């Protein structure tokens, strides 16, 4: 086991605070509409230019071990805030730095760190309660666009795209962000349920100009096993042919004589069919087939429920208004499933989301909810260069997460004003002792910091602006984009309540841990030069006694 080095008391805290400041100073220059860019080096390829706080934080590793511990703790603030709310990482970092900086002064002066932390926690709890009181629900597309615009650093086109996407697919719909292939941003919306499996043979194509197989008013056969023997399929094929409707087959696989017979019948015009593989694998495949069955009003033909292909009837088949099958995707439009059954299925999946332990599982379950309840929109981010597209894509991701947070918990006035307004609720608090009172005052001072940083990044005098905003009431604040004072809600400067709340709670949590730290244990440097004995004159590179 490698040797460890231990640092105690003020020496440990001072080093940790240095690390906090190094990371926070690099991140906070990006805050606000006039925030600056940060350039990140890449081992391979072009450097990345970004205004995304969490992207900057994730890149930082410091050479000094103890400083790096401090930096990593603040990085955790940014990451946790990003995971929970999707935005507000820079605000969280600025708040954490402010609480640590003010708290360190009190600890150095001999106050009890644990009482300071209790005071900080009490003040933050009061601030969160007040934030919830001043929060207002998002009701209009305009408000959604404004929230997205602010989070995208004032780019209105991004805000409008996201608002349009939510309008099209609903609040339950999935919105994904991809690299575009043109200079302009594009929005693609998929109606109905789409899964990533295409036709098993190009001979099913009946729209050659679009390379699609399109079926109008088809029956839909869902099977969880491979189909290779045509005799298994014949009874149901005959029933579908008599009904004079096309057929979509979704199975684990369709191969051999079964596939060949379907292709021949399709070419001859005897029965219009398309066969595709079922999406997913294992248990997820079964769940997705069941989703499709509920959406189309059919049943999955599976031995588990006692159903077999040979005995399948039209009653077990699903229906849809239209099906479009491409090389890689299948889209079911306007399935014939009953709404109560679909709603019950959505409720069941939501319960699974609440219990999911991994982000991957949660994401896949959320996709299933969206496909059943809403739709899927894809925002394709355009730009002249790869670097520009990457930077813009980061901002679109932030804006998208901020919008979801606003829909979830509502909105408060932006530009750091909401945190100024909650100070009144904290100022009335009484601590159990003088040290707790000092902890409350730490939070009171820290709540001004995001506004101070926004103003400083805009090149204005922070103290003057903070005093002017504090003298106002309600939504009155400073719009750094225009350099004017006024009603921020009316001018569209909004923040999601969830983002502001999460940033404050996470910042206070990590800052409290740093202030109550009294020792650090870290790996000793491996190639540290031998320390010269005290009192030897001229000890250095030239050796004892030599003076250069």
Swiss-Prot record:
ATP binds at residues 30-33, 51, 87-91, 415, 479-481, 495. One of its GO terms (cellular component) is cytoplasm. One of its GO terms (biological process) is protein refolding. PROSITE patterns: CHAPERONINS_CPN60 (PS00296). Transmembrane segments: none annotated. It is an enzyme of class 5 (isomerase). Keywords: ATP-binding, Chaperone, Cytoplasm, Isomerase, Nucleotide-binding. It is found in: Cytoplasm. Forms a cylinder of 14 subunits composed of two heptameric rings stacked back-to-back. Interacts with the co-chaperonin GroES. NCBIfam families: GroEL, PRK00013.1, PRK12849.1, PRK12850.1, PRK12851.1. Together with its co-chaperonin GroES, plays an essential role in assisting protein folding. The GroEL-GroES system forms a nano-cage that allows encapsulation of the non-native substrate proteins and provides a physical environment optimized to promote and accelerate protein folding. Belongs to the chaperonin (HSP60) family. This is Chaperonin GroEL 2. It comes from Burkholderia pseudomallei (strain 1106a).
């Amino acid at each position: 086991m490698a040797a460890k080095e231990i640092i105690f008391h003020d020496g440990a805290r001072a080093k940790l605070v240095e690390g906090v400041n190094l990371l926070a100073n690099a991140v906070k220059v990006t805050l606000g509409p006039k925030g600056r860019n940060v350039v990140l080096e890449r081992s391979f390829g072009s450097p990345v230019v970004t205004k995304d706080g969490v992207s900057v934080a994730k890149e930082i590793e410091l050479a000094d071990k103890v400083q790096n511990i401090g930096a990593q703790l603040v990085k955790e603030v940014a990451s946790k805030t990003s995971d929970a709310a999707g935005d507000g990482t820079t605000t969280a970092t600025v708040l954490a730095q402010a609480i640590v900086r003010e708290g360190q002064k009190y600890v150095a002066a001999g106050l009890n760190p644990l009482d300071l932390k209790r005071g900080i926690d009490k003040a933050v709890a009061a601030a969160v309660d007040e934030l919830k009181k001043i929060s207002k629900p998002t009701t209009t597309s305009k408000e959604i666009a404004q929230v997205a615009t602010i989070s995208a650093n004032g780019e209105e086109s991004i805000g409008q795209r996201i608002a349009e996407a939510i309008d099209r697919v609903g609040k339950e719909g999935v919105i994904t962000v991809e690299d575009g292939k043109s200079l302009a941003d594009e929005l693609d919306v998929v109606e109905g349920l789409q899964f990533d499996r295409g036709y098993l043979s190009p001979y099913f194509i009946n729209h050659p100009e679009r390379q699609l197989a399109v079926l109008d008013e088809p029956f839909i056969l869902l099977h969880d096993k491979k189909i290779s023997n045509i005799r298994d399929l014949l009874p149901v094929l005959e029933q579908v042919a008599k009904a004079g409707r096309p057929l979509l087959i979704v199975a684990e696989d369709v191969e051999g004589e079964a596939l060949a017979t379907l292709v021949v019948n399709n070419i001859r015009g005897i029965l219009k069919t398309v066969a595709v593989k079922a999406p997913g694998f294992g248990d997820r495949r079964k769940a997705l087939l069941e989703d499709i069955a509920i959406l189309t009003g059919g049943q999955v033909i599976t031995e588990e429920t006692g159903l077999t292909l040979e005995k399948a009837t039209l009653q077990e088949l699903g229906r849809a208004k239209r099906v479009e099958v491409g090389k890689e995707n299948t889209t079911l439009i306007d399935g014939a499933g009953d709404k109560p059954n679909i709603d019950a299925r959505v409720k069941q999946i939501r319960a699974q989301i609440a219990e999911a332990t991994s982000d991957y599982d949660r994401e896949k379950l959320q996709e299933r909810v969206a496909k059943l309840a809403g739709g899927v929109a894809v925002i394709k981010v355009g730009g002249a260069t790869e670097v520009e597209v990457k930077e813009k894509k980061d901002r679109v991701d932030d804006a998208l997460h901020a919008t979801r947070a606003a829909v979830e918990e509502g909105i408060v006035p932006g530009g750091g004003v909401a945190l100024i307004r909650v100070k009144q609720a904290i100022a009335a608090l009484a601590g159990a002792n003088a040290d707790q009172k000092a902890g409350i005052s730490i939070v009171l001072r820290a709540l001004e910091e995001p506004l101070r940083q926004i103003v400083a990044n805009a090149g204005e005098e922070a103290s003057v602006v903070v005093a002017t905003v504090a003298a106002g009431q309600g939504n009155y604040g400073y719009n750094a984009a225009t350099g004017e004072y006024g009603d921020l809600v009316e001018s569209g400067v909004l923040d999601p309540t969830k983002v502001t709340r999460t940033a404050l709670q996470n910042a206070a949590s990590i800052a409290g841990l740093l202030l109550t730290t009294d020792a650090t244990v870290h790996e000793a440097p491996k190639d540290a030069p031998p320390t010269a004995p005290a009192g030897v004159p001229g000890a250095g590179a030239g050796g004892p006694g030599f003076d250069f």
